[in-house]
């Protein structure tokens, strides 16, 4: 498998006119309003607001020669070995722990779902970064690193605020990391919930929530954009459609919200929008780019395997659009097929629909790695 070098690259809903209002949307809306009135888009002055902020800002994870099952399991075990007894008890949970589906993107997070980054020392944080950079691609690690740093910009003058900032993110490992037997990893907090499952040389990433606020920020003189591709690739797909295709794809002239986010495991929305069966080759290529902006969070060969699966499902997929179809517009979209649900929605708080973003990736046939065991036997 490929050698990789880590390169750093660049939540809250409101009621939709078409989609059902879920409990998650209510909670997200309330949280979003709290954030909207307190956001400070300037980077914290002077020193870092927390040790996790310092480490995430400055530490470059060590390289790995491959992203095979043995390397991933070794990195997970190295992280667990770095913890004392108390912290390890928080981080290491049974494979089928009831905490696994309790992930949330809404602050504050309860203490049961893993070890808190703010409770780790510098070496432990670096080992956690090494682990995340091994089980994710550079694109995926960039999100896992940059979303907590973006959340630092929501702190009031850089001061501690429960549920916000890089120190209030949680890392959990379910089961015993092994190159042969099932185990899982969860990294969650405000605007992020990554659920990875492993079984032999197969892995999955469902369900995964990715969001950010603000959309971009400055770090070390560089512009960081945690969600760089999700909006432009989706917009490019919509703009590639013919007039009649756009009419079929468009559900409402107003942006909708996520309907398959936190607390919605097992929910499959009704397929809406344009059938992708008659897309031209150029449009199919753009659709694959949209899928890659999500699936590409998986490391190399795992992303390629998943994209190959999805390519065979294009004829069964639907593409739905809400809102205006121009750059900067307050829009949302959904791509849905037999084994994929992808949702994207801006939140339009403070008059900028792209400064607060939500997205969701699910494989309803493989939630928390449900079908990995079967694949391992095939």
Which stretches of residues belong to each language-model region?
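Bacterial N-terminal signal peptides that target proteins for export
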Residues: 15-30
């Amino acid at each position: 498998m490929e050698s990789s070098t880590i390169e750093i690259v660049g939540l809250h809903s409101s009621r939709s006119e078409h989609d059902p209002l879920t409990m998650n949307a209510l909670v997200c809306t309330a949280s979003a309003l709290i954030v909207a009135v307190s956001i400070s888009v300037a980077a914290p002055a002077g020193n870092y607001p927390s040790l996790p902020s310092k480490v995430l800002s400055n530490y470059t994870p060590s390289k790995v020669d491959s992203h095979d099952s043995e390397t991933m399991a070794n990195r997970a075990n190295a992280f667990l070995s770095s913890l004392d007894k108390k912290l390890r008890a928080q981080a290491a949970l049974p494979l089928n722990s009831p905490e696994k589906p309790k992930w949330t993107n809404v602050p504050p997070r309860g203490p049961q779902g893993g070890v808190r980054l703010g409770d780790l020392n510098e070496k432990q944080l670096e080992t956690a970064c090494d682990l995340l950079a091994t089980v994710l691609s550079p694109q995926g690690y960039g999100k896992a690193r940059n979303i907590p740093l973006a959340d630092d910009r929501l702190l009031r003058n850089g001061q501690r605020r429960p549920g916000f900032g890089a120190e209030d993110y949680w890392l959990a490992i379910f089961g015993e990391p092994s190159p042969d037997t099932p185990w899982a990893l969860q990294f969650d907090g405000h605007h992020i919930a990554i659920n990875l499952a492993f079984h032999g040389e197969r892995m999955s990433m469902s369900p995964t929530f990715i969001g950010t606020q603000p959309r971009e920020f400055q770090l070390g003189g560089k512009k960081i954009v945690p969600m760089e591709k999700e909006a432009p690739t989706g917009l490019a797909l919509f703009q590639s459609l013919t007039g009649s295709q756009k009419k079929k794809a468009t559900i409402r002239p107003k942006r909708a919200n996520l309907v398959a986010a936190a607390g919605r495991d097992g929910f499959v929305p009704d397929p809406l929008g344009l059938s992708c069966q008659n897309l031209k080759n150029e449009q199919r290529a753009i659709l694959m780019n949209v899928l890659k902006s999500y699936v590409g969070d998986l490391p190399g060969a795992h992303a390629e395997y998943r994209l190959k699966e999805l390519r065979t499902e294009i004829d069964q997929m639907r593409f739905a659009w809400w809102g205006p179809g121009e750059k900067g517009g307050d829009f949302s979209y959904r791509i849905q097929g037999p084994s994929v649900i992808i949702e994207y929605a801006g939140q339009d708080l403070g008059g900028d629909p792209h400064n607060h973003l939500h997205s969701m990736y699910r494989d309803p046939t493989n939630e928390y790695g449900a079908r990995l065991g079967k694949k391992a036997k095939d």
